[in-house]
């Protein structure tokens, strides 16, 4: 390089460092973002340009414009006229005084550490019932995770270890009855995989070893009759297999139709 080119490169480098410092400085401290409607969307802290500390995410909710002559927010509930306000509803007034918002409801909340999710994270349904609780370490799922249906009943629970499923996992019907249960080792199914019908009767019993089908696999109809049965080894069929009609009559056996 010539002296002039070298000087130009140094200037560019200095300017880049200054601009980077300015950008980082602008992204430090408490930051709030808003939906196009003006409702609060996110609220959290930046440190050195990355998310750090508690962050909260909000549902937008409904937005109302004051079209009424009475000066009250028109929530436009079914059966109401444009100039009527349902006084049983709570709304928030914006700074300009011409827009009203539903009180903010949390959608998700959790903490960041150096830009990565850390610790307990919680999400909610719009009705404020819990939807999920999960745990993170350095941005990866680590620890228990629980999910719920909107009615409050549990839908799923299990454990992650450094981003991979481990241990016993259970899924439930919305009624609370157990739907499915299996075991994971380092992210792969290993052990029995059980399923049930909505009335609690067994639907299937299967086994995995290191993520591959293994041993006897059996499934049933809701009336209790067998539906299918086969034996596996190393992920492949091993020996005879049989399928049945719901009335108990054999449908197919060892690859030959009856």
Describe every region a protein language model picked out.
Residues 5, 71, 101-102:
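Selective for proline/serine-rich intrinsically disordered segments
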């Amino acid at each position: 390089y010539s002296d002039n080119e070298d000087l130009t490169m140094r200037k560019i480098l200095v300017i880049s460092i200054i601009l980077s410092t300015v950008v980082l400085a602008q992204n430090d401290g408490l930051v709030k973002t808003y939906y196009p409607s003006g409702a609060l969307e996110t609220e959290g802290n930046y440190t050195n340009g990355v998310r750090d500390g508690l962050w909260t995410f909000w549902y937008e909710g409904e937005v109302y414009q004051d079209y009424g002559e009475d000066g009250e927010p028109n929530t436009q509930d079914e059966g109401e006229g444009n100039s009527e306000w349902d006084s049983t509803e709570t709304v928030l007034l914006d700074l300009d005084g011409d827009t009203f918002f539903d009180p903010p409801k949390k959608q998700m909340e959790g903490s960041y550490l150096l830009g990565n999710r850390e610790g307990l994270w919680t999400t909610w349904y719009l009705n404020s019932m819990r939807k999920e609780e999960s745990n993170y370490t350095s941005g990866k799922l680590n620890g228990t995770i629980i999910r719920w249906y909107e009615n409050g009943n549990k839908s799923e629970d299990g454990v992650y270890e450094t981003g991979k499923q481990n241990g016993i996992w259970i899924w439930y019907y919305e009624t609370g009855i157990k739907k499915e249960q299996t075991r994971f080792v380092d992210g792969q199914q290993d052990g029995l995989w059980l399923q049930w019908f909505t009335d609690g009767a067994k639907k299937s019993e299967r086994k995995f070893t290191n993520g591959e089908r293994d041993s006897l696999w059996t499934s049933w109809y809701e009336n209790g009759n067998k539906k299918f049965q086969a034996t596996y080894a190393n992920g492949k069929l091993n020996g005879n297999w049989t399928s049945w009609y719901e009335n108990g009559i054999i449908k197919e056996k060892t690859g030959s139709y009856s």
